[in-house]
């Protein structure tokens, strides 16, 4: 059951809790509809790999919060949390104090942005073979872990997660099924290696797709291709 597909609403799920590695991983669950609330579990987890003598959990927490915060402004979540062994966290009072500050900052954001629509400069469509089914996860490998072959492509999605754009993920089949679909957007972004689901592969040999995209550009729309679109 894909959370971005229409049938997801039928399962009656109360909430979605997701681990936050960066802005895109936050949008991966904050954009899910038909649930009562979404909650972000922020890093670091209270585990010995970070909470040890010489470790710097405050630095990791700051990087994580600042990276994800801009995405919260675009697509608000309702709750935040941390997890792990509390005993380890108590041994780092500076960390506890910083998390207190994060919680207060989140409360300010929550009070001011819930139920509002953020300002959007342009409407952007990310075009690939999956469309909305894999929104925000179309270039994601093992959460927010660095992956050499995919890093630059994922960086584009990460940038979009907190940018002032109304972002949608559309597929080539969406274009075939709705001749006027592209009229809803200002820019199309197509990202990926040749002959992959990310870039579209043989879809670009379809005259129907070529005609629709060329018409879109002719009428003033922007097309950004990265990699081998």
Q: Whereabouts are the PLM-identified features?
A:
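Hydrophobic targeting/anchoring helices
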Residues: 1-150
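Helical hinge/lid and interdomain linker segments adjacent to catalytic or ligand-binding clefts
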Residues: 145-229
């Amino acid at each position: 059951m894909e959370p971005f597909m229409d049938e997801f609403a039928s399962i009656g799920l109360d909430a979605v809790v997701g681990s936050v590695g960066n802005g895109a991983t936050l949008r991966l669950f904050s954009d899910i509809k038909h649930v009562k609330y979404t909650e972000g579990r922020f890093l670091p987890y209270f585990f010995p790999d970070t909470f040890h003598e010489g470790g710097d959990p405050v630095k990791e927490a700051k990087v994580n919060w600042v990276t994800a915060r801009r995405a919260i402004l675009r697509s608000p979540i309702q709750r935040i949390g941390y997890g792990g062994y509390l005993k380890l966290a108590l041994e780092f009072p500076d960390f506890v104090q910083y998390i207190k500050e994060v919680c207060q900052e989140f409360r300010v954001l929550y009070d001011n942005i819930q139920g509002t629509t953020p300002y959007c400069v342009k409407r952007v469509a990310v075009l690939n073979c999956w469309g909305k089914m894999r929104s925000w996860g179309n270039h994601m490998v093992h959460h927010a872990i660095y992956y050499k072959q995919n890093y630059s492509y994922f960086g584009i999605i990460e940038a979009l997660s907190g940018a002032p754009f109304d972002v949608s993920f559309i597929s080539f089949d969406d274009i075939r099924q709705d001749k006027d679909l592209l009229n809803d957007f200002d820019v199309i972004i197509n990202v990926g290696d040749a002959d992959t689901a990310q870039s579209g592969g043989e879809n670009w040999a379809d005259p129907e797709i070529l005609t629709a995209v060329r018409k879109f550009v002719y009428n003033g729309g922007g097309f950004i291709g990265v990699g081998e679109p």
